[in-house]
A protein has these predicted regions:
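Nucleotide-activated donor-binding/catalytic signature segment of Leloir-type glycosyltransferases, i.e.
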Residues: 71-88
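A charged, aromatic-enriched C-terminal amphipathic alpha-helix characteristic of glycosyltransferases
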Residues: 167-198
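Short acidic/histidine- and often glycine-rich active-site loop of Leloir-type glycosyltransferases
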Residues: 117, 130-141, 145-146
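Conserved acidic donor-binding segment of nucleotide-sugar-dependent glycosyltransferases
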Residues: 140-141, 145-152, 160-166
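Glycosyltransferase donor-sugar binding loop
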Residues: 30, 57-70
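Aromatic "clamp/platform" in nucleotide-sugar-dependent glycosyltransferases that forms part
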Residues: 89, 108
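Short hydrophobic beta-strand element within catalytic cores of glycosyltransferases
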Residues: 125-128
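A conserved mid-protein helix/loop that constitutes part of the nucleotide-sugar donor-binding site
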Residues: 25, 29-48, 66
């Protein structure tokens, strides 16, 4: 009779880039183009912001699984070509973290949330939908912001709050990058894997 033993293997992220800033307020959403990832919700928020006469640049980075054409049509129909850039495939996702002031996770549901951890390792403030494991990733108003999933007005408002560089710096300062590295770094993964193998 074998006795089963379970060992949790932590997800790992290997992002060591400290991100450079620039003059145009830039936001980033990384994820496959899927209706559950929230690209359309973010586009609607960007439309509201642009309609108020404010400049913003939004990068949507991720592979297409059938939803990208709908996003492209929305961008074109609403005159957002100068405000939204789609990157359908890249092996250099880290370079887009380096361009961003803020990273968003607008998913309908989220479990581990690798993008959120990568952003935190870059020292970037987050705006997350209030679903799944997202509320566990941050303390709202301390090291990131939460918004009610589906509330476009609130999402646009949170994006505008982080236009203020001082607010972004405050949130970034409160990110515990050491704890993130200890929990999700390769050393922790290797240790857990060795435990699993009985080494």
């Amino acid at each position: 009779m074998y006795k089963r033993q379970a060992v949790e293997l932590p997800m790992t992220v290997g992002v060591d880039v400290k991100c450079d800033r620039h003059t145009r307020y830039t936001i980033l959403l990384v994820g496959a183009f899927d209706s559950n990832k929230g690209q359309m919700e973010l586009l609607q928020a960007v439309k509201r912001i642009v309609a108020e006469g404010k400049d913003i640049l939004c990068y949507l980075v991720g592979p297409d699984v059938g939803f990208m054409p709908k996003c492209q049509k929305y961008i074109q129909d609403n005159g957002l070509d100068n405000n939204v850039k789609i990157v359908s495939y890249t092996q250099q996702v880290v370079s887009y973290y380096a361009l961003a002031d803020v990273v968003l996770v607008c998913s309908t549901f989220e479990t581990f949330g690798r993008v959120a951890v990568e952003a935190q390792k870059c020292g970037l403030p987050l705006i997350l939908s209030d679903v799944g494991a997202n509320p566990e990733r941050i303390e709202d108003g301390v090291n990131g912001l939460l918004y009610q999933k589906g509330n476009i007005a609130e999402l646009a408002e949170k994006i505008e709050i982080l236009r203020d560089e001082n607010v972004r710096k405050m949130l970034s300062k409160n990110i515990d990058s050491i704890a993130i590295e200890e929990k999700y770094g390769i050393d922790n993964f290797a240790s857990s894997f060795c435990t699993l193998l009985g080494l």
